[in-house]
Amino acid sequence: MGKITDRVEDLAQPIVESQGLELVDVEYVKEGENRVLRVFIENPEGEVTLDHCENVSKNLDEKLDEVDPIQESYILEVSSPGIERPLKKKEDFDRFSGKLAYIKTFAPVSGNKEITGIIKGRDGDNIKVLKKDDDKELEIPFSQIAKAHLMVDFDNITG
C-alpha cells in the first residue's frame, strides 16, 4: 500500500502548496468494508479551515479521477492532522522543538523502542529527545524512527 500513498503524495503536494498549505501525511487504510484515503494538511499561517479542506478535497478528487492511481472505490478525507500530529520529516523535529512527543523506533535506543519525551531539536541526522520519565537525553538516528507524533502535555496545561 505504500506505493499508493507515495503516488497520492506526488499528486497532492502541488495542489496543497498552491493554496499556501503544507502536506503533512497521506494514509490509505481499510476500515470495515471501506477503503479510506486520508490526506492531512497544515496551514503554516494558522488554523486549517473547512474551506481549506474543501478546496484541497475538490481539486485532489478531480486529479485522482484523472490519473486514477487507486483501482478500488474509496472515501477521500482531507483534514488537519489534529493534536497528535505525525512527525514525518527531519524538519518537523526542528519546528516542534520543546514539544512533547511519542517516538517508536525500529530497534532499541538505550534499551527503549518506545520513547516519550521533549523534542530538543536535532544534530544532523540524529533527533535529540529529553526522556520524560528520567530526564535522560537521547540521540535517535532519524533512520531508526518507525513512527513519531506529538502528544498533549497534560502536565503543562494551564487554565
From Swiss-Prot:
Q: Which Pfam families match?
A: DUF150_C (PF17384), RimP_N (PF02576)
Q: Quick check: keyword Transport in the entry?
A: no
Provide the primary localization: cytoplasm
Supply one GO CC term from the record.
cytosol
What are the entry keywords? Cytoplasm, Ribosome biogenesis
Keyword Cytoplasm listed? The answer is yes
Q: Which InterPro entries match?
A: Ribosome_maturation_RimP, RimP_C, RimP_C_sf, RimP_N, RimP_N_sf
**Where's it found, cell-wise?**
Cytoplasm
- GO biological process, any: translation
What superkingdom does the record give? Bacteria
What this chain does, per the record? Required for maturation of 30S ribosomal subunits.
Provide the family line.
Belongs to the RimP family.
What's the protein name?
A: Ribosome maturation factor RimP
> What is the native source organism of this protein?
Halothermothrix orenii (strain H 168 / OCM 544 / DSM 9562)
The gene for this chain is: rimP
